[in-house]
Amino acid sequence: MNLDSTALAYQSGFGNEFSSEALPGALPVGQNSPQKAPYGLYAELLSGTAFTMARSEARRTWLYRITPSAKHPPFRRLERQIAGAELDAPTPNRLRWDPLALPEQPTDFLDGLLRMAANAPGDKPAGVSIYQYLANRSMERCFYDADGELLLVPQLGRLRLCTELGALQVEPLEIAVIPRGMKFRVELLDGEARGYIAENHGAPLRLPDLGPIGSNGLANPRDFLTPVARYEDSRQPLQLVQKYLGELWACELDHSPLDVVAWHGNNVPYKYDLRRFNTIGTVSFDHPDPSIFTVLTSPTSVPGLANIDFVIFPPRWMVAENTFRPPWFHRNLMNEFMGLIQGAYDAKAGGFVPGGASLHSCMSAHGPDAESCDKAIAADLKPHRIDQTMAFMFETSQVLRPSRAALETPALQNDYDACWASLVSTFNPQRR
């Protein structure tokens, strides 16, 4: 499909009750489901949470569309499925990958998905599946994910995400979130694209509580952007693909499913520029817990325990006195999947490059490599700015099982443990 070059418009805020109409008066006034909707549209509700959730937790959007979503033939299971569907046995070993190679054959967003790891089947209301995407052509079909909410983290190439509620344009250093069940199409603006995805099977992502930080800081609500209504009135045949319990199913439509003329609600897609994150850090000593870098979180029923946290390590000043400044050596209850969008990560002098990834599972010891450690111990502790960098982490409370495909890819580094092998004992009981 041809890309529409019309400049995109957005609405600002997080968790708002938004409304938008592409034609004047398309939104009903004072009710959701009138006997006759304006312009001959059909009213349809998209529920992102159960009806009886607390009002503060409820997610739903009313859509006013040209053709109801219910008008479709039976779905058929596709022969080509997502790579990495088969999970391997759990491993406590630390894993790291080089950037995955971009495809040589024409590959759209769906065909270029590789599941890296997961910790829950799609029929459970908790857990996360982690993917990388590799593409070199725009989608000519539409897709929705019945298994979870999608958090997209581009690393290479700009994307235009054409959704039922409007279009989002995202580039590396921005993220996008698409609600469970929302139909969309991915168009490539730069020819090739690579990035990461967290498929959240649990509670919808929200901003973390700030506690003693106060009422401002980290990701500020006004910097999240939601699209305005934008519809396609096309009667050309089109394939609609859905992901259902981990498998791809498809049917053929006689119209575009991106035909929503007006809508209102809070179950919406959105984007966020990571460069607007208000980074918090120490101005005295020690390295605070990395939870201070949390952008979004999906909570569990246990207070403070996340189903998934999305954490970034952005450009920042390091000023701590008498302190080992890199992230410390660590054994964590949580499971950490990391990626790198640009630059270098301050705990790894080499081997972890943009487009790469790593997985440190529950209680797997990790921390700065030997070179980074030696430099930090000997460093002159002047104020130092870590610049031109953006690493991130998907942190989850359930153990991640890598996929068989992720363990068999040539990008897997078989010598990852070697980065700590040259750490030597400097213990001297005679000298404090």
Curated annotation (Swiss-Prot):
Residue positions of the active site: 287
GO CC aspect terms: cytoplasm
Matches recorded under Pfam families: HgmA_C, HgmA_N
Molecular function, one GO term: homogentisate 1,2-dioxygenase activity
Pathway the protein acts in: Amino-acid degradation; L-phenylalanine degradation; acetoacetate and fumarate from L-phenylalanine: step 4/6
Residues that coordinate or bind homogentisate: 345, 366
GO process terms (BP): L-phenylalanine catabolic process; tyrosine catabolic process
E.C. code: 1.13.11.5
Coiled coil: none
Cofactor(s) required for function per UniProt: Fe cation
Sorted UniProt keywords: Dioxygenase, Iron, Metal-binding, Oxidoreductase, Phenylalanine catabolism, Tyrosine catabolism
Superkingdom of origin organism: Bacteria
Stored InterPro entries: HgmA_C (IPR046451), HgmA_N (IPR046452), Homogentis_dOase (IPR005708), Homogentis_dOase_bac (IPR022950), RmlC-like_jellyroll (IPR014710), RmlC_Cupin_sf (IPR011051)
Catalytic activity: homogentisate + O2 = 4-maleylacetoacetate + H(+)
Enzyme class: oxidoreductase
Binding of Fe cation, residues: 330, 336, 366
Family per record: Belongs to the homogentisate dioxygenase family.
Function: Involved in the catabolism of homogentisate (2,5-dihydroxyphenylacetate or 2,5-OH-PhAc), a central intermediate in the degradation of phenylalanine and tyrosine. Catalyzes the oxidative ring cleavage of the aromatic ring of homogentisate to yield maleylacetoacetate.
Assembly and interaction partners: Hexamer; dimer of trimers.
Protein name, UniProt field: Homogentisate 1,2-dioxygenase
